[in-house]
Amino acid sequence: MYTLIIPAAGQGKRMGAGKNKLFLLIDEVPIIVHTLRAFEKDKACKSIIMAINEEERPYFEELMQKYQIEKHVQFIQGGAERQDSVYNALQYASGVEYVLVHDGARPFVTNKVIRDVLTAAEKYGASICAVPVKDTVKKVEQGVVVETVERSQLNAVQTPQGFSVSLLLEAHRSAKQSCFLGTDDASLVERVGKQVGVVEGSYYNIKVTTPEDLLIAESFLRVQKK
């Protein structure tokens, strides 16, 4: 069993929607509802903790009722950064040995990816899902190519990411003490010298970040319905 943590306090400035991007609609259903439904199907998911902006609590609670989200969702105060939100949520992750941390704006995560991440977390203590990078990657400085990066070893990391609660707490506390801000939770675990397992993600498991992503998400959903 695991608890799902969703840091949902961000404002999604790159989307330019003027509101939390998780409230934007894909096929007339909010992004966050699509995401929650993916985990509703997983019996191993004991509960869900969402770190939110307190002023958005009434709307989140309304969505839970309107779309009949049956799993228990606990809303807690988010932090200034995503990392702070996850740390806050960890304080409430009781009665389970493992947590999965997932971006609320990844509505197309599959049950297979969820299960694989959990299995790897149970094996290694920490795990991520990722897909091989398909584009050529170049290092650029001041508008000029400095280096072409070897692509064969590069992976684009997604969520969910899985952790033992004790390990992730240790990693977050260490980062907090050193004022270290990581790009994801796995980077905090790497920083304390622990191994992170990797499983195959999915190219459909996109993060809806820009208006273009929203169009792609609409297309994905149409394909799924066929």
Curated annotation (Swiss-Prot):
User: What keywords appear on the UniProt entry?
Assistant: Isoprene biosynthesis, Nucleotidyltransferase, Transferase
Q: Does the keyword Transferase apply?
A: yes
Pathway assignment reads: Isoprenoid biosynthesis; isopentenyl diphosphate biosynthesis via DXP pathway; isopentenyl diphosphate from 1-deoxy-D-xylulose 5-phosphate: step 2/6
Say which enzyme class the record assigns. Answer: transferase
Xref: PROSITE patterns: ISPD
Q: Which reaction does it catalyse?
A: 2-C-methyl-D-erythritol 4-phosphate + CTP + H(+) = 4-CDP-2-C-methyl-D-erythritol + diphosphate
InterPro entries to which the protein is assigned, alphabetical: IspD, IspD/TarI, IspD/TarI_cytidylyltransf_bact, ISPD_synthase_CS, Nucleotide-diphossugar_trans
Protein's UniProt keywords contain Lipoprotein: no
Could you tell me which Pfam families the record lists for this protein?
IspD
**Annotated site location: Positions MEP for the nucleophilic attack:** 151, 207
Q: Which GO terms describe its molecular function?
A: 2-C-methyl-D-erythritol 4-phosphate cytidylyltransferase activity
Q: Which residues cross the membrane?
A: none
Q: What is its EC number?
A: 2.7.7.60
Q: Name one GO biological process term.
A: isopentenyl diphosphate biosynthetic process, methylerythritol 4-phosphate pathway
Q: Site described as Transition state stabilizer, positions?
A: 14, 21
Give the residues annotated as coiled coil: none
Q: Which HAMAP family match?
A: IspD
What's this protein's function? Catalyzes the formation of 4-diphosphocytidyl-2-C-methyl-D-erythritol from CTP and 2-C-methyl-D-erythritol 4-phosphate (MEP).
Provide the family line. Belongs to the IspD/TarI cytidylyltransferase family. IspD subfamily.
Cross-referenced PANTHER family = 2-C-METHYL-D-ERYTHRITOL 4-PHOSPHATE CYTIDYLYLTRANSFERASE, CHLOROPLASTIC
Q: Which NCBIfam families match?
A: ispD
The protein's name in its UniProt record: 2-C-methyl-D-erythritol 4-phosphate cytidylyltransferase
